């Protein structure tokens, strides 16, 4: 059975659509878990997805005896544009040492427990709320973060006409402690007086020979900076 998008076998709609977990070999199912903390809303968001063979393969709904829980509570099923996923969301104050557990039972009766932990909040060293930035020269933003986390920093500007946002983002891969916005890119910000500075720490890992993927994200509350 191929993971390509033209597949129509074993009850699967297509490798780009949605199918049922009981219709595939359980050893071919890719498990993908995401744990995200949104600091501004104090919300924990967990999601789980299951795909045939790889992340581009058929999105699978857990059917038959298969099930998924987060923190011992069943996750809610949703299907958006033929993509099946399971979600859980609730309010909680962030605590550094908290552990979270996804528990998945496949159709062969095997149970997998996957621990996840929210990354620590990156600490900005060169900017703070109310800082002013100059757009006629390169802008280096330094931070302190766990060296296993990648950190993405965005400058976001709200459109005055329709309320949408534009973002200019730079990512520091794990081990780096700064990002640089070049003056050429910053020149596009001349139309705004204030910007939101958004910071996100992310760690990713692959487990069990690539059959399990885990993403853990801390989304810091944005701060205002001025031009």
Give the predicted meaning of each segment.
Residues 123-185:
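Short helix-loop boundary/capping segments
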Residues 114, 118-126:
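A eukaryotic nuclear recognition-module signature that targets compact all-alpha binding cores
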Residues 12-15:
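C-terminal motif of bacterial Sec signal peptides marking the signal peptidase cleavage site
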Residues 1-5:
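Bacterial N-terminal signal peptides that target proteins for export
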Residues 17-117, 184-227:
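Ser/Thr/Pro- and often Gln-rich low-complexity regulatory segments
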């Amino acid at each position: 059975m191929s993971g390509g998008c033209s597949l129509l076998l074993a009850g699967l709609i297509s490798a780009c659509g949605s199918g049922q977990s009981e219709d595939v070999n359980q050893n071919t199912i890719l498990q993908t878990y995401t744990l995200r903390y949104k600091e501004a809303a104090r919300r924990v968001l967990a999601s789980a997805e299951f795909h045939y063979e790889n992340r581009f393969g058929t999105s699978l709904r857990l059917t038959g005896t298969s099930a998924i829980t987060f923190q011992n509570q069943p996750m809610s099923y949703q299907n958006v544009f033929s993509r099946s996923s399971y979600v859980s969301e609730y309010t909680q104050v962030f605590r550094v040492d908290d552990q979270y557990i996804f528990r998945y039972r496949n159709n062969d009766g095997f149970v997998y427990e996957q621990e996840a932990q929210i990354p620590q909040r990156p600490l900005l060293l060169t900017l703070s709320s109310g800082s002013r930035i100059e757009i006629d020269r390169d802008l280096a933003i330094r931070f302190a973060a766990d060296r296993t986390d990648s950190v993405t920093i965005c400058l976001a500007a709200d459109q005055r006409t329709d309320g949408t946002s534009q973002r200019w983002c730079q990512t520091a891969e794990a081990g780096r402690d700064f990002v640089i916005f070049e003056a050429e890119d910053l020149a596009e910000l001349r139309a705004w007086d204030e910007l939101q500075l958004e910071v996100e720490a992310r760690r990713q890992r692959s487990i069990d020979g690539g059959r399990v993927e885990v993403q853990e994200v801390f989304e810091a509350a944005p701060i205002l900076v001025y031009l």
